[in-house]
């Protein structure tokens, strides 16, 4: 039976028994199940958040990644939502950490997910309301771009392309904040 790559997991986190792939329910993917205690390992998606930040001159903020995946490529500020953290609070935190900016969330652009990839990416449109443009250790540099300057061929992820495309097309759900 084929199981999607589920990491290097071979032993049960509860009893250290051996994990094996089993089909528990028709139509569901195979799961790793402990042969000793029956514990089922579920691999949940990971939630990430991003913000397309508009500056007073109507340019947007992008950062050039200093980490893999996508080293040297451009993305908007974003990152993973911490367990128990409100998604909008994570968006504000990531803008502050990665761009040095305080922002106002203007609305949801969209939610992006892809087959066989764990991240679910929630992207907001935002406006800078304070702080000073500055990058952290996860970025090589930070810059602002007008719509015709966006480095489309040097964007890190499919979600970055799609969210920027949606942003410039005017996709915005202002009541979803």
Segments the model singles out, each with a brief description of its role:
Residues 1-9, 166-177:
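A broadly conserved sequence feature marking short terminus-proximal activation segments
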Residues 2, 54-97:
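Conserved Nudix-box catalytic region and its N-terminal flanking loop in Nudix hydrolases
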Residues 4-51:
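Acidic, metal-coordinating catalytic segment for phosphate/diphosphate chemistry
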Residues 21-23, 102-109:
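A short coil-to-beta-strand element that immediately follows conserved catalytic motifs
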Residues 44, 112-133, 143, 163, ...:
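Active-site-adjacent beta-strand/loop module that shapes the phosphate/pyrophosphate-binding cleft
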Residues 53-54, 62, 126, 144:
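Conserved hydrophobic "DFG−1" position in protein kinase catalytic cores
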Residues 135-164:
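NUDIX/MutT-family hydrolases
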């Amino acid at each position: 039976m084929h199981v999607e790559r589920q990491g290097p997991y071979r032993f049960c986190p509860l009893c250290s028994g051996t994990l094996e792939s089993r089909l528990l329910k028709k139509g569901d993917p195979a799961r790793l199940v402990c042969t000793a205690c029956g514990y089922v390992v579920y691999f949940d998606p990971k939630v990430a958040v991003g913000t397309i930040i508009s500056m007073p001159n109507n340019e947007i903020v992008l950062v050039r990644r200093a980490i893999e995946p996508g080293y040297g490529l451009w993305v908007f500020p974003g990152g993973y939502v911490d367990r128990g953290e409100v998604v909008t609070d994570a968006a504000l935190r990531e803008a502050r950490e990665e761009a040095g900016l305080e922002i106002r969330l203007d609305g949801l652009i969209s939610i992006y997910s892809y087959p066989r990839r764990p991240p679910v990416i929630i992207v907001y449109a935002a406006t800078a309301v304070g702080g000073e443009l500055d990058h952290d250790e996860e970025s090589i540099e930070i810059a602002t771009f007008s719509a015709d300057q966006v480095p489309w061929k040097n964007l890190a992820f499919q979600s970055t392309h799609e969210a920027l495309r949606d942003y410039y097309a005017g996709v915005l759900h202002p009541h979803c904040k």
